[in-house]
């Protein structure tokens, strides 16, 4: 029996390889097939309290992504030069920020140690930002971010969402989700968490900046956040018990089948 490892599948981005080869496929998101099992996202939960004091923080942290210059895989995300749209998105977002907020803007580029042959998005915006606003230490920066702007719907977006005020700024045609998440995506848009227009995202941030908590803690946004963590990233409190009970049940099932064969 094959059990694939837990995956976020970028919150439901189309990917059925594990389901096709596995008896069970462990996922952070809600089950999308009969062999899916939703399990708590241990990697994400450790970020839950790192921005609990977000209203007292002052930075705007934008997090970018990279892809290789030449395609290596068939993926449902930006491939090769498609990633360059980010440059325009970053510049447009920054241009539409209120002048008094621009000094708080930081850009976290994708680690070159991981993607050494990418398009170096950070180098492409050096004319826009001084070096002190181009940062490399993600964990240090997110702890000081009042709002995080994530340019891609992957693990980093989940970490930002669970920790405090977050905006996802992405290009829908390059990030394909299953229709199972249409309702959630529409609600994220209405709650001003998800944007595909950089200028609109910046204008929203300008509007809520002085009282971010009024937006983030509003009834509508809290409802959408709860739905998000129910459907896209399991964040149940008793995560260790859930994992323990699941593993014990699988072990018991394995040995029971073994005993049945030997009987």
Feature names for model-found ranges:
Residues 1-44, 157:
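Active-site and donor-binding regions of nucleotide-sugar-utilizing enzymes
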Residues 6-9, 32-36, 70-71, 113-122, ...:
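Short, charged/polar "capping" segments at the starts of alpha-helices
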Residues 18, 140-142, 187:
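Structural alpha-helical scaffold elements that stabilize or flank donor/cofactor-binding regions
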Residues 37-38, 55, 123-126, 146-147, ...:
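Catalytic binding pocket for nucleotide-activated donors in carbohydrate/polymer assembly enzymes
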Residues 42-127:
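Conserved catalytic-core segment of nucleotide-activated headgroup transferases in glycan assembly
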Residues 127-136:
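Active-site donor-binding acidic/aromatic loop of nucleotide-activated sugar
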Residues 135-145, 162:
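Short acidic alpha-helix that forms the nucleotide-activated donor recognition element
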Residues 230-263:
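C-terminal alpha-helical cap of glycosyltransferases
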